[in-house]
Amino acid sequence: MKKAKTAAALLCSACLVLSGTAVPTMADSVKVVTLGADLTQDQKNTMMKYFNVDSNQVQILTITNQDERDHLSAYVPLEQIGTRTVSCAYVKPTQSGGIKVRTANLNWVTCNMIATSLSTSGVKNCEVVAACPFEVSGTGALTGIQMAYETATGEQLDSTKKELATEEMVVTGNLADEVGKNDATTVMNNSKIQVIKDNVQNVDDIYNIVVNVAQQNNVNLDSDQINKIVELLKQIAQQEYNYDDVKATLEQVEQNTSGDNDELGDIDDEEDDTVNAGDSADGDDILNNVDNSALGGDIVESSTENPSLEEESGLTEDDGDDQLSLIHISEPTRLALIS
């Protein structure tokens, strides 16, 4: 069942995979909007309204089901990919501040899961809004966001790191099935911090880090769960990440999942003010510039910059489980859930 959940979840936002035909609308290519090909025109208009941009302000890419198949067939069976592509994203590379993520109508994956996994793919600084006109699970959003970033910057991310990021999302998703999204993200993210920060290569040392992080956060893991995390972190350690490149993102996720939003203290205040002034000088903070009224009421939301948004919008640890099951539901319903 857990494998079925993860496979289904990988598909939910897979339309973000950006090998589809690009339709540049202006010379400014640093911002990219992706729209699922199987959305109606009204739904596409709704997403543009939610992103609060006009078509002449961004580069727009239409993502097809074939794009999903090209990029996801290595991870999930074709019969589970389905035939519809509906999810959307808005991506803006930035110069500093780490990875900032906001989600809407994604009821399984959270902003923190996306942010910490995206850092593994080699992205350093970026603003991301991942959304859909109606609720889907959203784990597959990572793949498309990676590709959107490449399109926006004109630079290719390292293929090994992208694969590790996808694996990280799968491992975290499986763990979330068993211990909850917040605890799963905490163990993965905080263990990754220590491995990268201290350049830990020894497998036994990595094992001890995972065990200690789990114990410190009162997360009960069995040996199989621990070993899967250790194996992934061993591969991540071999990539020799520069901690300064991922620090802002990983420490923000740590802060969010710990529930202590004052933890970073005054040390980062001056830097944060500079970051905000620099990246939002044009008034184009895409995370806080969305128009929620476009999606109507009862939106499931999360934001790395506003951890309370998950609770306020009703995104709980149990949300999404029923949405992901492929058992005993009709084909049209299944396609709607995984697209």
Question: What does each model-identified segment do?
Answer:
Residues 20-28:
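Sec-dependent signal peptide cleavage junction
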Residues 119, 129-137, 143-224, 230-231:
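Soluble oligomerization/assembly scaffold segments of membrane-associated complexes
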Residues 70-125:
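Signal peptide-directed extracytoplasmic domains
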Residues 27-43:
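Short N-terminal segments immediately surrounding and downstream of signal-peptide cleavage
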Residues 264-326:
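C-terminal low-complexity, Ser/Thr- and acidic/Pro-rich disordered "stalk" regions positioned immediately N-terminal
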Residues 12-20:
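Hydrophobic core
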